[in-house]
């Protein structure tokens, strides 16, 4: 028995592959089982095309066994097997894939099979955890069996052996444990179950293992039953993925159970989205919109992405490239036989197929959300409560490139409707002479509703959108307009010519009072002017056009040391008794007028939700008036 050397610069290539190509040692089992699945698929295909092969898909299986004393894991299949030439070509030449050649030979006729292998290197991943691998195989239709054995880069041997049935068994002898690596865990039943469930759950053939269980039997010595151990062959994998089944054949509770188990959620999903695409790229997808917001969703720790499978084999647990950032809340799986994988089958090559799938999924998710908004408003508002903020972030991100896609999905509170409305609903209810979309920002709907700056618009029956999240004003700035109607803050002041003319008259009539207040407050305010919007309140603060008070609060929250501040424009209601008292004091008692001016400014700060410049000074002023 002569030892043969691997071909193709074997020592360097095998060492490179073992230490560089794969990043997770545990995937060795995925690769060996995928090879076994390919072997079964090849014989299954032969049975479909050759009447002399009396086998059906139900006849095939993959068995997994462990010998802890010998430190071996054995994977056995009853697939097509190999002869001596196959062993030389497939295992003696690194990076020679028999499965790939098979797919090339039969072409489109493999549509009913799930042949996985492409590169011919997966088998050698076993050497990441093993110091010796033995392959015993007999090709279907042959009377001779062969044994291939290797300890790695030193070469391999091929000899005849005894094997009664067609198929292949791969016997992997695990390395000894080290301080850094605990290879013995791969001999444990729980670990093997975990790996099968994680990587090979949807292999289309049963993966079986002899499992020791216990059952209760009546005891002749005690009233309590005895627990007697017994061994049972248990199928570890699901075989048929739920996303491969027809939607009509799957009950809603099955989808819910799959979601909860797969994504470790206690709540059912709010929405289930199924996709089956054929064409340039063939794939199936099963997507879920969660029923609740994940606790870490709005944190940096949250990882977006869909589980990615290739022909039922897990390739990536979370593939971020399949979801745009604005739909990062979606969970689910994508399975495609058309993906261009890299040599380790761990990472996806960034290619056209992936982009096509991602683009298609984005359109599908948008379509489902739009349908929910139209037909199930209450359900959509529940979704909006959970993930609406993410859609807003999507509008403002990447310089607004996604705004046209997302703008019709947005909801804001309406001052007149007293409920959430879309931008389209707002525009459809606008007065004929209204040229802009008004909005007002604040911490809560109640606080915004009480803002004195809104009194005039409310009296006119103008609808105002209430912005209660820090991102809302950035959304308005990014959109700029909707259906040719520009966004305008309700805090911006008079917009019609008559109101502007009246403001000019008031400013001229009371110019001494405004000048006095400005001089008293100094740089605390940029301007003091008459208000055209106040009705029952004496004073309010408005901001300049570049930055609002809510944006100032946001920047202060993000950067506490930030010096960015909105302009402070003090508006006074010339028809309010407080203004009359101020005007009289300017002439009769300038010192008291200064107190009035400071009090009015502090009141305006409080109404705007801004911190007082001098809280102690404010209380002193109030107490002074009470003497």
Can you say where each PLM-predicted feature lies in the sequence?
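GHKL (Bergerat-fold) ATPase N-terminal catalytic module, capturing the glycine-rich phosphate-binding loop
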Residues: 1-186, 194
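GHKL/Bergerat-fold ATPase module in large chromosome/replication-associated machines
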Residues: 115, 136-155, 175-627
């Amino acid at each position: 028995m002569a030892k043969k050397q691997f071909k193709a610069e074997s020592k360097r290539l095998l060492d490179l592959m073992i230490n560089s190509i794969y990043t997770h040692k545990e995937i060795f089992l995925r690769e060996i089982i995928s090879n076994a699945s390919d072997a079964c698929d090849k014989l299954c295909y032969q049975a479909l095309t050759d009447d002399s092969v009396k086998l059906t898909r139900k006849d095939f299986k993959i068995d997994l066994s462990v010998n802890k004393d010998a430190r071996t894991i054995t994977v056995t299949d009853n697939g097509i097997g190999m002869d001596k030439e196959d062993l030389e070509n497939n295992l003696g030449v690194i990076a020679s894939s028999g499965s790939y050649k098979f797919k090339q030979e039969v072409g489109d006729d493999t549509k009913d099979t799930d042949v996985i292998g492409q590169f011919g290197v997966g088998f050698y991943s076993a050497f990441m955890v093993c110091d010796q691998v033995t392959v015993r195989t007999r090709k279907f239709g042959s009377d001779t069996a062969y044994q291939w054995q290797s300890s790695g880069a030193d070469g391999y041997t091929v000899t005849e052996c005894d094997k009664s049935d067609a198929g292949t068994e791969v016997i992997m002898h695990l390395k000894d444990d080290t301080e850094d690596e605990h290879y013995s865990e791969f001999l444990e039943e729980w670990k093997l179950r975990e790996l099968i469930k994680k990587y090979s759950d949807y292999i289309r053939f049963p993966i079986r293992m002899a499992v020791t269980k216990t059952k209760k039997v009546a005891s002749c010595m005690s009233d309590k039953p005895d627990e007697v151990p017994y061994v049972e062959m248990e199928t570890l994998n699901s075989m048929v993925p739920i996303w491969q089944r027809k939607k009509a054949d799957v009950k809603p509770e099955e989808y819910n159970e799959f979601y909860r188990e797969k994504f470790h959620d206690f709540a059912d999903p709010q929405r289930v989205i199924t996709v089956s695409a054929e064409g340039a790229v063939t794939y199936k997808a099963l997507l879920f919109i969660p029923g609740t917001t994940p606790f870490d969703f709005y944190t940096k720790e949250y990882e977006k992405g869909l589980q990615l499978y290739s022909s039922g084999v897990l390739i990536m647990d979370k593939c971020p490239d399949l979801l745009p950032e604005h739909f990062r809340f979606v969970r689910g799986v994508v399975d495609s036989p058309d993906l261009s994988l890299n040599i380790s089958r761990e990472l996806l090559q960034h290619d056209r197929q992936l982009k096509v799938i991602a683009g298609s999924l984005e359109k599908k998710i948008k379509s489902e959300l739009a349908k929910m908004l139209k037909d199930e408003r209450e359900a959509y508002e529940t979704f909006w409560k959970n993930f609406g903020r993410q859609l807003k972030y999507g509008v403002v991100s990447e310089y607004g490139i996604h705004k046209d896609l997302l703008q019709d999905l947005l909801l804001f509170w309406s001052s007149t409707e007293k409920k959430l409305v879309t931008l389209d609903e707002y525009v459809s209810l606008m007065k004929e002479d209204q040229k802009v979309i008004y909005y007002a920002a604040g911490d809560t709907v109640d606080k915004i509703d009480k803002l004195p700056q809104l009194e005039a618009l409310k009296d006119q029956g103008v609808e105002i959108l209430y912005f209660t999240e820090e991102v809302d004003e950035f959304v308005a700035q990014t959109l700029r307009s909707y259906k040719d109607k520009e966004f305008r803050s309700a805090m911006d002041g008079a917009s019609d010519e008559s109101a502007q003319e009246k403001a000019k008259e008031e400013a001229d009539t009371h110019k001494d009072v405004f000048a006095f207040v400005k001089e008293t407050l100094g740089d605390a305010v940029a301007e003091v002017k008459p208000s055209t919007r106040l009705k029952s309140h004496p004073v309010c603060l408005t901001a300049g056009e570049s930055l609002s008070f809510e944006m100032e609060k946001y920047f202060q929250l993000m950067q506490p040391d930030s010096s960015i501040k909105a302009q402070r424009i003090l508006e006074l209601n010339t028809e309010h008794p407080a203004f009359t008292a101020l005007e009289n004091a300017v002439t009769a008692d300038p010192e008291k007028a200064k107190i009035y001016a400071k009090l009015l400014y502090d009141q305006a700060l409080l109404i705007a939700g801004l911190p007082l410049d001098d809280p102690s000074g404010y209380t002193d002023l109030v107490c002074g008036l009470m003497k």
